[in-house]
Amino acid sequence: MSTQDERQINTEYAVSLLEQLKLFYEQQLFTDIVLIVEGTEFPCHKMVLATCSSYFRAMFMSGLSESKQTHVHLRNVDAATLQIIITYAYTGNLAMNDSTVEQLYETACFLQVEDVLQRCREYLIKKINAENCVRLLSFADLFSCEELKQSAKRMVEHKFTAVYHQDAFMQLSHDLLIDILSSDNLNVEKEETVREAAMLWLEYNTESRSQYLSSVLSQIRIDALSEVTQRAWFQGLPPNDKSVVVQGLYKSMPKFFKPRLGMTKEEMMIFIEASSENPCSLYSSVCYSPQAEKVYKLCSPPADLHKVGTVVTPDNDIYIAGGQVPLKNTKTNHSKTSKLQTAFRTVNCFYWFDAQQNTWFPKTPMLFVRIKPSLVCCEGYIYAIGGDSVGGELNRRTVERYDTEKDEWTMVSPLPCAWQWSAAVVVHDCIYVMTLNLMYCYFPRSDSWVEMAMRQTSRSFASAAAFGDKIFYIGGLHIATNSGIRLPSGTVDGSSVTVEIYDVNKNEWKMAANIPAKRYSDPCVRAVVISNSLCVFMRETHLNERAKYVTYQYDLELDRWSLRQHISERVLWDLGRDFRCTVGKLYPSCLEESPWKPPTYLFSTDGTEEFELDGEMVALPPV
């Protein structure tokens, strides 16, 4: 037999021990210390308190009078909050919500309960939004919580135009204000916004803040202000302030050349779930700048998430929801050939894209799991509509609404019918949902659905976009009468794509000019609004051929489509046919430009190193 001791670990013992300590606490058995807060007594065990709190550990081990006392009075502590911490010490369960978390953090900071502090930090970071980010910035600064402070500051920078009028912004300390106004990452399109924010803060309490006039104004990049603004500003200043203003602005001169991050934004087409150029992954996320004709890499959704819904809000926030993820025990590798062998799980995930960090940030999940839900933003709320789901017909009818300020979902009235697929757009604060030849309108203020005029053609998997008071329903598959067979929309040889327009004021559909397409192509049409113009992004070639993409622009007065841009093969590779396409404003400096790589079809077996691309001969780069 082996002379070594055999070690066996009973994992249930720790749980049993904690439960027994909790029982002793509830029955006040073997307690050796009484905490007194606001007249309320809390009989406890020194050993338990010292285990979770550095404050109590130091108190009981100091050798001072407190270590020998049986009753200890705690000041600057709330009784209800202390009860939460004591419960955590005995059970590991921490109860907190939006109304208690800040007081809980303050008390945990005083008592030095690091586990509670970390849980509170994580909770607050997850809850940061435009309404509370300035207040949480001051809160984090007060308690020297750097992780929370940086997260709150990023949200202040991102939502600057929405937060600088808030009372919390007016209450900012001078140092925090300078830290914000000096930031290169402010999401502002005009320096006038920064100037206005600075002046509002100074004028909030002129008497006490006049001493900061020079230091605050030195953060304004005057060279970025229009001449009209500069002239009007100086003319409106009191005579005694003009010299101070000039002195303050002079200090900002070295920063004149540096634009704020928001001034560098470019409108881009965002492709989620595009076929990856990387053989080791199934999908990729990229964005294309029509102005610069460049492609940038986006961080792909976590955990190989795909079949999601996507939306870009009027405030330029990007969200994805739902979808599927591979089951870990069935996914053998990441290669494309294993895709059919992989089992998937439908999820209710919900993510916000942090454009500055180029990363997806998890938010509160939806109430239902969904595959390819239709996402829209209406009156400040995000709606997740229908989508395929494991719940069958009932789940396909469900609709839920997300409150961006509260970070929570609530159910609203369900769809009148259940569909596996639908398209949704927003016009005049109403949501229009379309599929086949049907359309329903949702009125948020009355939480009701109304059936609208039917389309002339029955099509599924079409692309829809709202432009002004019109809705465009483009492409898709025709549903043949009686047989149910799906055929590509447009002409028989695929040389055009069907377009229908809905007038929301007249409640009527009409046929519009078809979009020209190459014969026998597989266009994979996506309708988008770019630079205040209705456009379609589409493929010119069949899926079995080399991918070539173009954008067409619609002229509403002439009812005509014209070629807007031919996208070089060197820029976009084959995106497949299942990609999501939206339009949003992103920061090129925060993205990685995607270098062009010759596709595998360009390499010939005879060793040829030159080929034709975009109408010209190109030599392969050296290996």
UniProtKB/Swiss-Prot annotation:
The record ties this protein, via SMART domains, to:
BACK (SM00875), BTB (SM00225), Kelch (SM00612)
Judging by the UniProt lineage, the source's domain of life is Eukaryota
List each copy of the BTB domain by range: 31-98
Residues bearing Phosphoserine are: 300
Domain BACK per the UniProt entry, residue ranges: 133-229
The Kelch repeat ranges on this chain? 317-380, 381-429, 431-469, 470-529, 535-581
* Pathway info: Protein modification; protein ubiquitination
Q: Name one Pfam family in it.
A: BACK
Q: Which GO terms describe its cellular component?
A: Cul3-RING ubiquitin ligase complex; cytoplasm
The UniProt entry's GO biological process terms, in alphabetical order, are: gene expression; glucose metabolic process; lipid metabolic process; phosphatidylinositol 3-kinase/protein kinase B signal transduction; proteasome-mediated ubiquitin-dependent protein catabolic process; protein K48-linked ubiquitination; regulation of cellular response to insulin stimulus; response to insulin
Keyword entries, A-Z: Kelch repeat, Phosphoprotein, Repeat, Ubl conjugation pathway
GO MF annotation terms = ubiquitin-like ligase-substrate adaptor activity
Reported function: Substrate-specific adapter of a BCR (BTB-CUL3-RBX1) E3 ubiquitin ligase complex that acts as a regulator of the insulin signaling pathway, modulating insulin sensitivity by limiting PIK3R1/p85alpha abundance in adipocytes. Targets PIK3R1, the regulatory subunit of phosphatidylinositol 3-kinase (PI3K), for 'Lys-48'-linked polyubiquitination and proteasome-mediated degradation.
Q: How does it assemble?
A: Component of the BCR(KBTBD2) E3 ubiquitin ligase complex, at least composed of CUL3, KBTBD2 and RBX1. Interacts (via the BTB domain) with CUL3.
Q: What is known of its domains?
A: Recognizes the BCR (BTB-CUL3-RBX1) E3 ubiquitin ligase complex substrate, PIK3R1, through the 4 tandem C-terminal Kelch domains.
This protein's name = Kelch repeat and BTB domain-containing protein 2
| Organism annotation | Homo sapiens
